[in-house]
Amino acid sequence: PDGFDIAMIKEIGKRMDKKVEIQNMEFKSLIGAMESNSINTIIAGMTKTKERQKSVDFSDSYYTSNQAIILKKDSKIKKLSQLEGKKVGVQEGTTGDIIASGEKFGEKNKVIVKTDVKRYKKGVDAVMDLKNGAIDAVVIDEKPAQEFVKNNAKKLKLVVDSAGAEYYCIAITKGNTAYKEEINKQIKAIGKKIKARPEVEKIEYQSADEAWEEYKEQYF
């Protein structure tokens, strides 16, 4: 079945009577692709930030997540603030990158101390370097972090010390207000449908616990 994001945008497209064409891209290239008019919609677990809002508009939130820290089993680190000066792996351009760089990604989000950031195209590459001792930690979305640790349970562990909730939104071409309003209308309607019929979430969209499946190509 489709992952949460793909199922969501397909449902929105169906409700708007629009054909949805899916393009897989590296996360860091998405906003640039929108600015060059190669795409007009981004749904990729993207958090709304002030910096991104300079380039794109955002819909209302459709999913809430947190960041997590992946560590080696013997690490003494227990919270984000203890990453000060540590070598931290992140997926380039993601919220984890923003946090590890000591920057805010929202008004209500805590700022952590600045780390020695090492950026990767794929989350799996950061985890590999962690296992090999090249870095001290990986900061990444909680859902893929859980999967990485589950697959490396003898060597890795997970710490969730949220810098604040992050809200996934759909990015839209700057200034396309009518399109944004229509997408917001459909997000609200789909949300009500899921709440009214919990079984629909599993049948049509997968459960929230499986939503990260859609991001596998980005992380692995």
Where in the sequence are the language-model features?
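Ligand-binding clefts/hinges and TM-proximal coupling segments of bilobed small-molecule sensing domains
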Residues: 95-118, 150, 157-159, 187-220
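Short beta-strand->loop
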Residues: 1, 86-93
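Alpha-to-beta junction loops
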Residues: 17-19, 35-44, 86-87, 122, ...
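Extracytoplasmic small-molecule ligand-binding "clamshell" domains
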Residues: 1-46, 119, 183
